[in-house]
Amino acid sequence: MKRVYNFSPGPAALPQEVIKQAAEEMTNWRGSGLSVMEMSHRGREFTEILATTKADLRSLLSIPDNYKILLMQGGAIAENAIVPMNLVGSKAQPATIDFVNTGHWSSKTIEEAHKYAKVNIAASSEDKDFTYVPARDTWKLTPDAAYVHICTNETIGGVEFDFTPDVGNVPLVADMSSNILSREIDISKYAVIYAGAQKNIGPAGVTIVIVRDDMLGHALPICPSAFDWKLVDEHDSMFNTPPTYPIYIAGLTFQWMLRQGGVAAMEQVNIAKAKLIYDYLDSTDFYVNSVPAANRSRMNVPFFLKDESLNGKFITEADAQGLVQLKGHSSVGGMRASIYNAMPIEGVQALVAFMKDFEKKYG
């Protein structure tokens, strides 16, 4: 059966080399006679997988030694609660958290944070339907905030930070679920980075948390032990049974990325892929994307047909061409092409060619 180009926003496409290797090792991991899915998480085989996975991630992102890598469960949605529970405990209560609201996922984080702290919306792009990132000089920060939170890429609106904000001595926390490993970043500018795996890392089930060591030990008394970063770190991400198979696939993805040349090489490919789509969108009025160039996401490209009555035809005909999962989020409609690291440039070329043909046919 021919493989399709999968533009799903998540769970997203995996590198074909990773899928092939996982298939080959499914029933017998490297001569062990075991599938990774049935290994003891404390056995020699999985301990090796875990250590290699964490070491490769540290290498890919140049993570400094004073940062811990935690492999957790619950996705970024769970971290919306876990982050404040871990960071506000040492502050006078109620603590204040500053948020920059750039869209759907930022809003979800803010909604959850109200349960644990006072919330200050330091900046928001809601005035223009979340189509931009507010300039840093417009932010109204709280001097003694527990932390400042940003979502570096909004998958629904297709809005991405093109800068790392300077927030002074207040810890900067970032949800990087949809653009981690897609561009080079300076980890030392952040106190905490978290990311669900199912976009640029692997299948759903494991959540990456990168936390500076001075951020440990500040949990609220109500924080469940399994979600206390200090305890998770002390138990090497095995306070409870970890999501072993998603960790294994994440490890294969990290090794694939290293073979491609690492994050710097991936970033150049991602720039090229995004440019192909945006250049075409800017050349026509048949399709519309309203995000300013500086804030356009390299990972998620939403676009709309000027004649929305053609939406159904677009999806049906794209599916027939092996271009799948292009329907936009239900909250905004239209179309969305998610072009994470695993999407080859050939897939983007095929999509743009289809879009041009569709315009000729119906424009």
From Swiss-Prot:
User: Is 4Fe-4S given among the entry's keywords?
Assistant: no
One annotated GO biological process: pyridoxine biosynthetic process
Name the Enzyme Commission number(s) assigned to this protein.
2.6.1.52
Q: Which InterPro entries match?
A: Aminotrans_V_dom, Pser_aminoTfrase, PyrdxlP-dep_Trfase, PyrdxlP-dep_Trfase_major, PyrdxlP-dep_Trfase_small
Q: Name one GO molecular function term.
A: O-phospho-L-serine:2-oxoglutarate aminotransferase activity
Residues engaged in binding L-glutamate: 42
List residues binding pyridoxal 5'-phosphate. Answer: 105, 155, 175, 198, 240-241
Report the pathway entry.
Amino-acid biosynthesis; L-serine biosynthesis; L-serine from 3-phospho-D-glycerate: step 2/3; Cofactor biosynthesis; pyridoxine 5'-phosphate biosynthesis; pyridoxine 5'-phosphate from D-erythrose 4-phosphate: step 3/5
- As stated in the Swiss-Prot or TrEMBL entry, residues carrying the post-translational modification N6-(pyridoxal phosphate)lysine are 199
> Which co-factor is required?
pyridoxal 5'-phosphate
Catalytic activity, as annotated: O-phospho-L-serine + 2-oxoglutarate = 3-phosphooxypyruvate + L-glutamate; 4-(phosphooxy)-L-threonine + 2-oxoglutarate = (R)-3-hydroxy-2-oxo-4-phosphooxybutanoate + L-glutamate
Q: Which keywords does this chain's UniProt record carry?
A: Amino-acid biosynthesis, Aminotransferase, Cytoplasm, Pyridoxal phosphate, Pyridoxine biosynthesis, Serine biosynthesis, Transferase
Q: How is the cofactor bound?
A: Binds 1 pyridoxal phosphate per subunit.
The main enzyme category here is transferase
Tell me the CDD domains matching this sequence: PSAT_like
Q: Principal place where this protein is found?
A: cytoplasm
Keyword Transferase present in the record's keywords: the answer is yes
| Subcellular localization, as worded in the UniProt entry | Cytoplasm
Q: Explain the purpose of this protein.
A: Catalyzes the reversible conversion of 3-phosphohydroxypyruvate to phosphoserine and of 3-hydroxy-2-oxo-4-phosphonooxybutanoate to phosphohydroxythreonine.
Q: Which family does it belong to?
A: Belongs to the class-V pyridoxal-phosphate-dependent aminotransferase family. SerC subfamily.
**Subunit composition?**
Homodimer.
Q: What is this protein called?
A: Phosphoserine aminotransferase
Q: Give the organism, scientific name.
A: Janthinobacterium sp. (strain Marseille)
Tell me the organism's taxonomic lineage. Answer: Bacteria, Pseudomonadati, Pseudomonadota, Betaproteobacteria, Burkholderiales
